[in-house]
A protein has these predicted regions:
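Bacterial N-terminal signal peptides that target proteins for export
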Residues: 1-11
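Bacterial N-terminal signal peptides
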Residues: 9-19
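N-terminal low-complexity, intrinsically disordered patches enriched in charged
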Residues: 18, 35-36, 136
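N-terminal export/targeting leaders of redox proteins
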Residues: 20-22, 26, 91
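N-terminal leader/linker segments that initiate helical-solenoid repeat arrays
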Residues: 24-85
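Amphipathic alpha-helical repeat scaffolds of TPR domains
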Residues: 45-46, 72-92, 115-150, 176-190, ...
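Structural recognition of alpha-solenoid helical scaffolds
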Residues: 55, 59-67, 79-83, 97-105, ...
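Alpha-helical repeat scaffolds
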Residues: 97-113, 140-173, 193-207
Length: 220
């Protein structure tokens, strides 16, 4: 019961994080570094390698339902990372959609916690989206967007909550996950980030999807 109350508090906290973010030259990694999802289903996207290349034909009003449909318990972590990256960029176009998506993803996690059976995948999704929204807000705050994009970018304030702690808890519930270690490395700094990346690399089989994503990330 204590554990359930603790997680409920984490998910509902509204205090803003005041720490200065890591501002890598290539931009915040959860937003600016596309992930290779392999053959898994992902949200529609434009062609080309650019990080900010949404499909102009996509109906953003469908974002919450489409994203929840893709965030199944069976979906691999790397596919969820790319879907949540794309979802964050789409959500930046419409503040109502952004709030709706975050609320829906948090509700899934909170529901599992309230039921006394915290779901690792739901907690990961919630933590990852919180940190993605934070990094998206950092991009606007620190003038990292081209003027036309900045004018349309509505994710300007950080959401409350500590998404990183939810990802760490998700890893514990999952019994360890190299893919989640990789994700955690992209939302932490210094020694913590390096340790997450080291553990992910140690567990990544040669030629695996994780190995490819680690190699891609090393270029930034």
């Amino acid at each position: 019961m204590v554990q359930t109350r603790s997680f409920t508090g984490v998910l509902l906290v509204v205090a803003l994080t005041l720490a200065v973010p890591r501002l890598a030259e290539a931009g915040p990694p959860l937003i600016c570094h596309p992930f290779d999802p392999g053959s898994q289903a992902v949200l529609p996207w434009g062609s080309g390698p650019a990080w900010n290349n949404p499909d102009n034909r996509y109906d953003v009003q469908q974002l919450t339902s489409d994203t929840l449909r893709l965030l199944t318990r069976e979906a691999p972590v790397l596919a969820r990372m790319e879907n949540l990256r794309r979802a964050t960029i789409y959500a930046a176009q419409d503040p109502r959609v952004a709030n709706e998506l975050l609320s829906a993803v948090l509700a899934r996690a909170l529901s599992s916690v309230s039921a006394g059976a915290p779901d690792a995948q739901a907690l990961f999704n919630a933590g990852y989206l919180i940190e993605s929204y934070k990094q998206a807000a950092h991009m606007h705050r620190y003038s990292m967007l081209a003027p036309p994009t900045a004018a349309r970018w509505t994710l300007r304030s950080e959401p409350g909550g500590n998404g990183y702690s939810l990802v760490i808890r998700a890893m514990s519930l999952a019994g360890g996950s190299a893919d989640m270690e990789f994700a955690a490395s992209l939302m932490s700094e210094g020694t913590a980030s390096a340790n997450h990346r080291r553990r992910a690399a140690a567990a990544a089989a040669q030629g695996s999807l994780l190995a490819r994503n680690l190699q891609n990330a090393s270029r930034y």
